[in-house]
Every structure is written in C-alpha cells, then in structure tokens.
C-alpha cells in the first residue's frame, strides 16, 4: 500500500477483560461513523455468547461489527487467519471512506494484526513427543520453570495450566536455539497506521468489575449456555486442539457438571481465573506492543482518546 492510500489511521483500543473496551469503542465508533473490528478469539463463535461478553444486539444493529458470530465451534480460525482477514477488511472499510476501530483483548489476534507473525519454524514431532512425555512424567511446573529461565517475557504471557503453548515455546527454543521473544523482534513493519491505545484502570477497580461481570453472566444464563455446550459438543471437549471450549467461564462449569467441584467453588474459580487472565493480558501488552495508556473512564474518555491518538478534528 502506498503512503497516498494510507489516508486514515486505524484506532486500536485494547485492555484487560472487563476494562470497558466495548462500550468505549461504541462511543468512539459513533463519533467517527466507524466500523468495529473485534479482536476477540471467543466472540467470533456463534455458540459463545454470554461467556464471551459479546456486544448486545442493539450495539450490533447500531454499529457494524466484524468477526462477531462468524464461526461455529469446531471451525478452525487461527490468529494468522484473523490477521489476514482483518487486514483485508480494514482496507475495504477505508475504500468505503470510513474509519475502522479495532477493539479486543485477545493477545495473539492483536499481535498478529499489528505486527505480523514472524517466521517461526514448523513443528518437530520428535521434540514435541519428548516434551509431552516429560510433561506427563514431571508435570507442567517443571517445564514452565524452564521456560521462565530461558524466555521470561514469553513465560509471563502464558497460563501455566494450558500446556500447548508452553510445549510449543520450548520446542521453538530447541529447534532454533532462539527464544520466541527474540524471533518476534524481527517481524515486518505494519502496513497500516495503527494508533494503539490501552485502557488504564486501577487493579482493585478492575478486579471489582470482573467479579461484578461474572455475577451478571451467571444471572444472565451462563450456566445454561455452558450446559448446552457441554451436552452438544462433549466430544470436542476431549480434543486437545479445540481451545474455544477451554475458555475461562465455561471450563470451570464443565468441571461442575462432571462433579469435580461444587457450584460456588466453580464461580469463585471463574473470578480468580479471569483476574489471572487480565494480569497476563496486561503483561503481554506492556512487553510486546507500543501502547499509549489512557484513563478508561470519565465523560471525556472518548474525545481524549480521539484527540491524543487518532482524529483530533473529530474530537471537538
């Protein structure tokens, strides 16, 4: 794309879960007459509604959203797929003389779109099998501690209980002799003019919002939604490569259905695991992306962000 074609900046609003990204994006999209690109790896699935905190039907009618309800559980859609498709849609939005606002918190979706994925090596089955056997024998904590020593930045972005990315990170180190973090430093320069704003929110306030959101999800029917998924997609739950059903909020309820925990404990774990996820998101954003952090709340939040990051004339 030539510089002459890059007429419009692309505003990117990111932040931890429950930080108010979607509401702010709706406000800004209204000011810009923009379309929203959802960078959320769960909202793209039709079946994951309450637990993924999708925009309301009213919001979807008022502002055009991309990558909401476009896939069904079981359809593969990687971060690379998202980056390629989102890039093409942003170009289309610009060609229609409109703005695009990217909003979300899925770290790999955002990094793929904003920076492009580098040339990571293909998998090595022998190495992967050995690491998987070591995981089964020694447990994930030992492997996670190894990664923390070799690549602390990558380790800080991972959930120690989710082992697929842990094994892949160690596999890449063995294949290349380099860490994932160092390999990612050589990615292509983005072809679009991204203006990245992160929503800053005090940790106690964020955690309070997370607890409130979980309670509201339960009251809105999360248990029933999870039970439907559990019954209809039971076989997929046993598939290691299907990560959509391993989402926080659903996985804990699946354990409740299987009598591995009681209901109150499941809800407590949803809140705890969501807080852990928010912490990993913040670590990722601060280590991997060039973000301008701004106050998430207040009546002037939307115009302040427009003025500072994107479209000063539209903030007046």
UniProtKB/Swiss-Prot annotation:
Which reactions appear under catalytic activity for this entry? adenosine(37) in tRNA + dimethylallyl diphosphate = N(6)-dimethylallyladenosine(37) in tRNA + diphosphate
Domain of life of the native organism = Bacteria
Q: Does the keyword DNA repair apply?
A: no
Q: Does the keyword Nucleotide-binding apply?
A: yes
Q: Which SUPFAM superfamilies match?
A: P-loop containing nucleoside triphosphate hydrolases (SSF52540)
Tell me the cofactors it needs.
Answer: Mg(2+)
User: What are this entry's molecular-function GO terms?
Assistant: ATP binding; tRNA dimethylallyltransferase activity
> Which is a GO BP term held by this UniProt record?
tRNA modification
Gene3D superfamilies reported in the protein's UniProt record: 1.10.20.140, P-loop containing nucleotide triphosphate hydrolases
Q: List residues binding ATP.
A: 15-22
Keywords for this protein: ATP-binding, Magnesium, Nucleotide-binding, Transferase, tRNA processing
Q: EC top class, in one word?
A: transferase
- Pfam families in alphabetical order: IPPT
- Residue ranges, annotated region (Interaction with substrate tRNA): 40-43
Q: Where does substrate bind?
A: 17-22
Under InterPro entries, the record lists: Dimethylallyltransferase, IPT, P-loop_NTPase
**Protein EC:** 2.5.1.75
Identify the residue position(s) of the site Interaction with substrate tRNA.
106, 128
Task performed by this protein: Catalyzes the transfer of a dimethylallyl group onto the adenine at position 37 in tRNAs that read codons beginning with uridine, leading to the formation of N6-(dimethylallyl)adenosine (i(6)A).
The record's family statement is: Belongs to the IPP transferase family.
PANTHER family per the UniProt record, alphabetical: TRNA DIMETHYLALLYLTRANSFERASE
Fill in the subunit field for this protein. Answer: Monomer.
Under which name does UniProt file this protein?
tRNA dimethylallyltransferase
Please tell me the species this chain comes from.
Chlorobium limicola (strain DSM 245 / NBRC 103803 / 6330)
Gene for this protein?
Answer: miaA
């Amino acid at each position: 794309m030539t510089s002459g074609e890059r007429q419009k900046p692309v505003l990117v609003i990111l932040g931890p879960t429950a930080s108010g990204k979607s509401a702010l994006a709706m406000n800004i999209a209204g000011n810009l007459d923009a379309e929203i690109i959802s960078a959320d790896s769960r909202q793209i699935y039709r079946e994951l509604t309450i637990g993924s905190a999708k925009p309301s039907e009213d919001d979807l009618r008022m502002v055009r959203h991309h990558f909401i309800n476009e896939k069904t559980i079981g359809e593969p859609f990687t971060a690379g797929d998202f980056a390629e498709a989102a890039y093409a849609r942003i170009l289309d939005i610009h060609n229609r003389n409109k703005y695009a606002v990217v909003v979300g918190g899925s770290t790999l979706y955002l990094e793929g779109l904003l920076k492009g994925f580098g040339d990571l090596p293909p998998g090595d089955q022998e190495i992967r099998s050995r690491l998987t056997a070591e995981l089964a024998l020694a447990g994930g904590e030992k492997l996670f501690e190894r990664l923390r020593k070799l690549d602390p930045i990558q380790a800080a972005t991972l959930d120690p209980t989710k082992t697929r990315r842990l094994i892949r990170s160690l596999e890449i180190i063995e294949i290349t002799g380099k860490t994932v973090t160092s390999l990612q430093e050589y990615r292509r320069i983005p072809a679009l003019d991204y203006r990245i704003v992160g929503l800053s929110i005090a940790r106690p306030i964020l955690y309070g919002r997370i607890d409130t959101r979980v309670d509201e999800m339960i009251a809105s029917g999360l248990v029933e939604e999870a039970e439907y998924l559990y019954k209809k997609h039971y076989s997929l739950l046993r598939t290691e490569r299907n990560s959509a059903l391993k989402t926080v909020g659903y996985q804990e309820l699946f354990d409740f259905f299987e009598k591995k925990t009681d209901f109150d404990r499941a809800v407590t774990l949803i809140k705890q695991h969501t807080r852990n996820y928010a912490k990993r998101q913040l670590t990722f954003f601060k280590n991997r992306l060039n973000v301008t952090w701004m106050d998430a709340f207040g009546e002037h939040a939307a115009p302040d962000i427009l003025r500072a990051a994107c479209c000063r004339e539209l903030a007046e």
